[in-house]
């Protein structure tokens, strides 16, 4: 399996709440059915807010997390798929090209957002060790 991971940054003119609400409700609604129709394994979002960065990291690491170690992206979005061809079908679909892709201008920072792709391994799922 493979994963396409987006280190997302909100547009400068959006609040954290506006950004997280938009990607969770509007943008994901454009994309979910298309992903499912093309055998995509999973589509997940991790929402990183100033509260989670400050409060939760501080609680988990008891104030021992150096500030320079904290990456301040607003969200991490991950699409997991079995073959690259599965994901290419999504990107080549007319709905992706006319609705999903153009929607990025409504929320994504055009220069800060970053992308990575690699193979995907699952070691624990549903509270059970996966071998």
UniProtKB/Swiss-Prot annotation:
One Gene Ontology term of the molecular function aspect: monooxygenase activity
EC number: 1.-.-.-
UniProt KW keywords: Monooxygenase, Oxidoreductase
Metabolic or biological pathway: Secondary metabolite biosynthesis
Residue span(s) of domain EthD: 13-109
Protein family: Belongs to the tpcK family.
Function: Dehydratase; part of the gene cluster that mediates the biosynthesis of phenalenones such as herqueinone, compounds that have been reported to treat tumors, bacterial infections and/or mycoses, and rheumatic diseases. The non-reducing polyketide synthase phnA synthesizes the heptaketide backbone and cyclizes it into the angular, hemiketal-containing naphtho-gamma-pyrone prephenalenone. The product template (PT) domain of phnA catalyzes only the C4-C9 aldol condensation, which is unprecedented among known PT domains.
Protein name as it appears in the record: Dehydratase phnD
Annotated organism of origin: Penicillium herquei
Lineage: Eukaryota, Fungi, Dikarya, Ascomycota, Pezizomycotina
